[in-house]
C-alpha cells in the first residue's frame, strides 16, 4: 500500500499534497516538530516529532519504502528514501531518483561550500511561484501512479495482504 510522507516544516504544498492523497485514497503523514494545523481528512495524519536536527527526516527515512512517495526539499533525506526505493518530489515539482540524486547531493555540498566562503552573500533562492505549484501537482500525480504500481508489484499484486 502506498503512503505519502510530507517533510512538513516550511513545506508550501501541504494542501495540494493532501488533495492528491485523498483523491488516490492513500494515507498521508505530515511530519513536523509542530506548528501545523490538524488535518481535516481521516487519511491524513499529523506526526509531531521532538525538536532537534533531522528528527523529522529520520522518522520519514525509517518508514519510507518501495511504493511510497516523499515530498521534501531536504537532499540528504531524499537520498536516504531513494535508496530505500521511495519516490521523491520536491515542492517545486523536481523529482529525485537514483539517476540524479548523486548530482543533487554534489550540488548541495558545492553550494554550501560557496555560501560558507562568502559570509556577506545574502538572499536565497527565488520565491515559490504558481508555476512551481503546477509543476509539483503534475509531478506528484505521476509519482503517485508510479508508486502505486510499484507497491502492487512489490506485494505480488495483492494489496489486501499488505
From Swiss-Prot:
Q: Name one Pfam family in it.
A: DUF188
Among InterPro entries, the record links this protein to: UPF0178
Q: Which family does it belong to?
A: Belongs to the UPF0178 family.
What's the protein here called? UPF0178 protein RHOS4_24670
Amino acid at each position: 500500500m502506498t503512503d505519502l510522507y510530507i517533510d512538513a516544516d516550511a513545506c508550501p504544498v501541504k494542501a495540494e499534497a493532501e488533495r492528491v492523497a485523498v483523491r488516490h485514497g492513500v494515507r498521508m503523514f505530515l511530519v513536523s516538530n509542530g506548528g501545523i494545523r490538524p488535518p481535516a481528512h481521516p487519511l491524513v495524519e499529523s506526526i509531531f516529532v521532538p525538536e532537534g536536527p533531522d528528527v523529522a527526516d529520520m522518522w520519514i527515512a525509517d518508514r519510507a519504502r518501495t511504493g511510497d512517495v516523499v515530498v521534501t526539499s531536504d537532499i540528504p533525506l531524499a537520498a536516504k528514501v531513494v535508496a530505500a526505493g521511495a519516490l521523491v518530489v520536491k515542492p517545486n515539482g523536481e523529482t529525485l531518483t537514483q539517476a540524479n540524486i548523486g548530482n543533487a547531493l554534489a550540488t548541495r555540498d558545492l553550494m554550501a561550500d560557496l555560501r560558507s566562503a562568502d559570509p556577506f552573500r545574502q538572499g536565497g533562492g527565488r520565491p515559490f511561484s504558481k508555476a512551481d505549484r503546477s509543476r509539483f501537482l503534475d509531478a506528484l500525480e505521476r509519482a503517485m501512479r508510479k508508486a502505486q504500481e510499484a507497491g502492487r508489484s512489490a506485494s505480488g499484486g495483492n494489496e489486501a495482504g499488505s
